[in-house]
Amino acid sequence: MDIPAKKFGFFTASAMVVGIVIGSGVFKSAGDVINASGGNLTVALLAWFIGGLIIMISTYAFSIVALKNTKASGIIDYVEDYFGAKMAYMVGWFVQFVYYPVLVGILSWLAGDVTQILFGLDNAIWPLTILYFIGIYALNLISPRIAGKTQVSTMVIKLIPLVMIAGAGLVVGLFNGNTLTALSERATNVTAGTGAGLAAAVAVTAFAYDGWILALSITQELKDAKKILPKALFFGSAFIVAVYMLFFLGLSGVVSNNEAIVNAGSLDTSVIAAERLFGVFFGNVVSVMILISVLGTLNGLTMGAVRGMYQIAVRGHGPATRHFTDLAKNDAPVKGGLLSVAVSVFWLGVWYGNFQGWWGGFIDTSVLSIVFLYIAYILVYVDIVKNFDELPSWKRYGVPILATIAALYLIYGAFTSAPLMFVYFAGIVFVILGIGLLLYGPTQSALDTGKKN
């Protein structure tokens, strides 16, 4: 087996953390966090800080595992190494049938939302959603190479609107007094209900902070992984937290707490801020950058989604492994990708039902799909405590225990924000996992039979 060259240093590793995590989540979550905080900007800022602290603790805990097994490249590998193939299969099944398809659908909707605003369209968000949904899957199935190049090109663009709105908004807000007003006056149109509070707001930030685990995939390619990886994860995460909090304060300089809540769950708050700060033309330029950021995140998630079933099947477990390990001439796992399309349509339907009042409440699948993945993270933390006896006590016990508490706090916050919707979502997930468990079975994988993979 070929071993990748040791070619990446501290800066590249840190930049990868920033590039993967920063995306559309922070633009969408602005109003959501204020709403979940009960309209209190100070509580919302604290939520952003605590949410960032959670990913800093989580990334450090995972760096411990990554340095022990540099051949592994993600949560499924880590779980398989210490909890066996079946548990890893179940985690992979969750990622393929819940995590990826949920987020692909929602990101398609967000792209439709910002496009509708940019062009001043009415009632176009769902047709645009479908257009983006079909287009991004088609790109990844027909031309995966172009999809990969697209992902790299959008990384830098993601930072530009964040920095511009943060800087200009802070200056304007301090001069006009809006920032101080936002910090001192609670919003009056909160819709979060009895679940509003710090824990619920922290859970909402999980959507904006998601993706950090993917940065561990380059561990074996770092020049001095033991020194570089923990530092890169820490400083990269700290940079993200600082940018997010400054961006959030920048928004408060031109968008009131009440306005942010009215536009909760969409990108409208960020677009409004851009127009007020830079005028219609330059505001639209910033909005285009936000759209590019959304599409970059959507493309990255879709790249994972179309390969998810292949990653399950190639390990030799689950249904029709030979079927799902077949690759097209362009090396795209088309059959697994088409299954991903079908599953994403289902979850997009759940998201659509939120706006039609089908569920009697809002099932925030964007947050819940991420929060539920932290259950799998806890398995990794348990493994550190049980098996990493060569570590000093603070690493073997302190770090994983703190990371476990952080994960449980996120889960608690998601539950308290909307208990009934949490239960509905959990019910759907358990059914999906139950189906996966019924279909689990050791079969010969493509690797075992020498098929192309």
Question: Language-model features: where?
Answer:
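Membrane-interface loop-to-helix entry segments
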Residues: 112, 125-178, 233-238, 372-375, ...
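TM-loop-TM module centered on a large, flexible mid-protein loop between adjacent transmembrane helices
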Residues: 77-80, 84, 117, 237-299, ...
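Hydrophobic transmembrane alpha-helices that form the core helical bundles
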Residues: 57-133, 137-141, 146, 291-308, ...
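A generic transmembrane alpha-helix motif of multi-pass inner-membrane proteins
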Residues: 369-373, 379-382, 386, 393-453
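Helix-loop-helix connectors at the membrane interface of multi-pass transporters/channels
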Residues: 76-86, 108-129, 161, 219-225, ...
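Helix-loop-helix junctions that connect adjacent transmembrane segments
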Residues: 2-6, 120-124, 153-287, 419-421
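Membrane-interface "cap" regions at the ends of multi-pass membrane proteins
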Residues: 1-42, 55-56, 60, 71, ...
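Select transmembrane alpha-helical segments in multipass membrane proteins
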Residues: 7-17, 43, 84-97, 129-132, ...
